[in-house]
Amino acid sequence: MSAPAADHNAAKPIPHVPQASRRYKNSYNGFVYNIHTWLYDVSVFLFNILFTIFFREIKVRGAYNVPEVGVPTILVCAPHANQFIDPALVMSQTRLLKTSAGKSRSRMPCFVTAESSFKKRFISFFGHAMGGIPVPRIQDNLKPVDENLEIYAPDLKNHPEIIKGRSKNPQTTPVNFTKRFSAKSLLGLPDYLSNAQIKEIPDDETIILSSPFRTSKSKVVELLTNGTNFKYAEKIDNTETFQSVFDHLHTKGCVGIFPEGGSHDRPSLLPIKAGVAIMALGAVAADPTMKVAVVPCGLHYFHRNKFRSRAVLEYGEPIVVDGKYGEMYKDSPRETVSKLLKKITNSLFSVTENAPDYDTLMVIQAARRLYQPVKVRLPLPAIVEINRRLLFGYSKFKDDPRIIHLKKLVYDYNRKLDSVGLKDHQVMQLKTTKLEALRCFVTLIVRLIKFSVFAILSLPGSILFTPIFIICRVYSEKKAKEGLKKSLVKIKGTDLLATWKLIVALILAPILYVTYSILLIILARKQHYCRIWVPSNNAFIQFVYFYALLVFTTYSSLKTGEIGVDLFKSLRPLFVSIVYPGKKIEEIQTTRKNLSLELTAVCNDLGPLVFPDYDKLATEIFSKRDGYDVSSDAESSISRMSVQSRSRSSSIHSIGSLASNALSRVNSRGSLTDIPIFSDAKQGQWKSEGETSEDEDEFDEKNPAIVQTARSSDLNKENSRNTNISSKIASLVRQKREHEKKE
């Protein structure tokens, strides 16, 4: 346990208030530069190279919300959709803010990371280099119990929380639950089917669970009915982790955390646990003179698991936790944690997109494209903001007959496009007259020639990199299957694909290119004609020369191949214009026009009821038509409106309970021993998930070649209005969760 700090108002120490350590040396607070800081910067440099190659574009939004160096900060990040890429992206982009937002905002977040990740040698190296704070997770410690012991549910239908035990050989292996196990520990079924926490152990053969095993799978029902072997993990002590976080904050550092816990591929956030709130409250309770800024950070990926995709990183408005919160935490910890946790959850809604299921997400994205004027190109941050607002509007009016009707029409329209093989942004590009068809034919031939040229130019690098492409794909899919088997919340395991592609490429690429270089040196020494293009007979110089040449060839092929792929994507609408009957094309275009008009009318009617600045958004962004590039105007407009009246959009449908059951563990006599830091990641009421976006294709085809401590009173008023919007979301969340519980 952490050493208790003396309460200023009472002589008796308070267990849940940590010690404010003044002797802790923090190499990552921005005030010192040593070997640890240098390793951090080297890691950021490497990550930046990797992300420049893997992502086509990374946009950072709301950089002004990141507190300056010297302000204790917690970056609360969500959704955790790309395993190790997520924290690496946040760390690198936050450190690189010195180039866009000034050196004073260049922070070095140290992430709270699952202890199991530090057991992976490659991940452990970067984890230690970047000041990672390990946290044990109870589910990672599950181990098989004696095979002679079995558990079963005597009345699974009426009392699923009551678990009985029996022994195959009572003489040599007695059950003895009271001696073997303890409350707040974890039981697990075979093959990672389900886990459940122990509430109490009334006798040697009975266990009462805090919540029953999930019985959605028939295999679980079969095992609990007939009896099964099981796994067990002793309750964990998070005191050391909390103290490490407090030490970072007390020395004016920056801590990062994904409060959902492990990564997942669901379309909405997992429940947020109380640990993140206790980190901020414990720090200010120990030192009432300090203020902690809790900054929400949202990550948005367009095709997250694909090479050359796009990403948007968004920092939201900070929540300032001060000494007043600390005093409240000392007097009534549970209520204070609940209050702050709600604020943090609301703030995460403001920077993330949340849909109840995959179909709704696809409909919302299609609705945004239909609402957006055909030839207007919006920047990625604007697309993210509009998607978020549409999701929130849908959540509020989903039972409105007009919304139900529109959802069906949009869904049918998407199916029609799928049958033709078109994307929405390609529909209005289709031509119907004979003259236009002739022009399309000529354009098709020209683009085919260009595509062939770029394909040939990209061949050398593609051939060189083919072994890595193949191994990356095979190994990442293998890891995704393994992760899916172990996880209780993943759907397809797509959150693991990009991470393992990058890790495998990072390890294999240097090995492969060293091998290529050595082979070329041997070839140059044996073949005399090769000396024409080899600069020297020195083996080291030859190695450097060949290695650089191979890297340059691969990178050149990457860039030319990228243009070739964009050209290839633009061929389909030309082909459809030539081959498909004009009436069928006109029918699809008419359907789109009518659907766009109806959708716009409904948005214009309902939008102002949800967002006070709706008219301003529509006027400033969508009044620009006919090919006008509104990237700069729209981005600045969206940024201003994000500060003035953020939409706080969320799907509301599948977010976990705001008042986490972890709060019951916080009381005036409690400690930090078993407070959960990460979400339990229990499976909710989600239906399905996937991820597709036309925005990359649309951009590609059209282009083939703490807020400062002292804020003004006006901004305080705006923040108050933001809080009102967040409260509406919180209310909807609670209503939805209560409804799910009743079901």
Swiss-Prot record:
Ranges that cross the membrane: 35-55, 443-457, 459-473, 502-522, 532-552
InterPro entries named among the record's database cross-references: GPAT/DAPAT, Plipid/glycerol_acylTrfase
Pathway info: Phospholipid metabolism; CDP-diacylglycerol biosynthesis; CDP-diacylglycerol from sn-glycerol 3-phosphate: step 1/3
Modified residue annotations for Phosphothreonine: T673, T692
Compositional bias annotation for Acidic residues: 691-700
Catalytic activity field: sn-glycerol 3-phosphate + an acyl-CoA = a 1-acyl-sn-glycero-3-phosphate + CoA; dihydroxyacetone phosphate + an acyl-CoA = a 1-acylglycerone 3-phosphate + CoA; sn-glycerol 3-phosphate + hexadecanoyl-CoA = 1-hexadecanoyl-sn-glycero-3-phosphate + CoA; (9Z)-hexadecenoyl-CoA + sn-glycerol 3-phosphate = 1-(9Z-hexadecenoyl)-sn-glycero-3-phosphate + CoA
Impact when changing S664A: In GPT2-3A; increases the enzyme activity of GPT2
One GO CC term on file: endoplasmic reticulum membrane
Residues on Cytoplasmic side: 56-442, 474-501, 553-743
Residue(s) carrying Phosphoserine: S632, S637, S647, S651, S654, S657, S664, S668, S671, S688, S693
Region span, Disordered: 682-743
Additional remark text: Present with 3100 molecules/cell in log phase SD medium.
Record-given protein name: Glycerol-3-phosphate O-acyltransferase 2
Source species: Saccharomyces cerevisiae (strain ATCC 204508 / S288c) (Baker's yeast)
